[in-house]
Amino acid sequence: MEKREITGVQGQVNNIEVIFKEYYGSLCYFASRFLKDEEVIEDLVQDVFIALLEKKMLFQSEVHLKNFLYLSIRNSCLNYIRNT
């Protein structure tokens, strides 16, 4: 099984741009089920991608990555609702 590495260090595999383009729209749509403010939604989705880049995570498969992204944005939305 091929692992997908997410890093921001030059000279290493850097798939974050591809992943961002692939999932940004669907994550924003998913977040809109919880929140109505588009600016907040975009900020939360971007924060998830920043966390992904900063943590330099390694995923077993595309499914694991997708699950991480959707769970992260769900939790971010719920935290936002709880704190406002």
Segments from the language model and where they lie:
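Sigma70-family region 2
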Residues: 9, 49-64, 83-84
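Arg/Lys-rich amphipathic alpha helix in sigma70-family domain 2
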Residues: 74-84
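Bacterial Sec-dependent N-terminal signal peptides
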Residues: 2, 19, 76-77
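Conserved RNAP core-binding helix
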Residues: 20, 38-55
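Residues at secondary-structure transition points
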Residues: 14, 18, 22, 39, ...
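Structural recognition of an alpha-helix C-terminal capping motif at a helix-to-coil junction
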Residues: 29, 43-50, 63-75
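A short, charge-rich alpha-helical start-of-domain segment used by transcription regulators
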Residues: 6-29, 33, 53
